[in-house]
C-alpha cells in the first residue's frame, strides 16, 4: 500500500515538474515589444521609407543605412540615386 501511494505521489510530482498538469496560464516571459523607430534627422522625410529626401545634413552611417536598406544612395554633388 505504501509503495502504491509513493509511486502515485512520484508520478504526480513528475507531471507537475514537466508542466503537463497546468497547460494554461503564464509559463514563460512575455517578449519585449520592438523599440520605437524614429525617422532619421536631417530634413523632410520621404513617403514611407524613413530616409530624408535630401542628402544634406545626414551622417555617413545614416546615408549608408538608406543605401543598403532601400537602394537610395547619396553621391557627392548629385544627391540620391535609385
Swiss-Prot record:
* GO MF terms held by the record: chitin binding
- Keywords of the record: Amidation, Antibiotic, Antimicrobial, Chitin-binding, Disulfide bond, Fungicide, Pyrrolidone carboxylic acid, Signal
Q: Which residues, renumbered to this chain, carry the PTM Pyrrolidone carboxylic acid? A: 20
Question: Where is this chain's protein located in or outside the cell?
Answer: Cytoplasmic granule
The disulfides recorded in the entry are 51-66, 55-73, 67-74
InterPro entries linked to this entry? Penaeidin
Known Pfam families for this protein? Penaeidin
Any one of the GO BP annotations: killing of cells of another organism
Question: GO CC terms on record?
Answer: cytoplasm
Serine amide modification sites are 81
Q: Which domain of life is it from?
A: Eukaryota
Q: Which residues are the signal sequence here?
A: 1-19
**What's this protein's family per the entry?**
Belongs to the penaeidin family.
Function recorded in the entry: Antibacterial and antifungal activity. Presents chitin-binding activity.
Protein name (Swiss-Prot/TrEMBL): Penaeidin-3d
Amino acid at each position: 500500500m505504501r509503495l502504491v501511494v509513493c509511486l502515485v505521489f512520484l508520478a504526480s510530482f513528475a507531471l507537475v515538474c514537466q508542466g503537463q498538469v497546468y497547460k494554461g496560464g503564464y509559463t514563460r516571459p512575455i517578449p519585449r515589444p520592438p523599440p520605437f523607430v524614429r525617422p532619421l534627422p536631417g530634413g523632410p522625410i520621404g513617403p514611407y521609407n524613413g530616409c530624408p529626401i535630401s542628402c544634406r545634413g545626414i551622417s555617413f552611417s545614416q546615408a549608408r543605412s538608406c543605401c543598403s536598406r532601400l537602394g537610395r544612395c547619396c553621391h557627392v554633388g548629385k544627391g540620391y540615386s535609385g
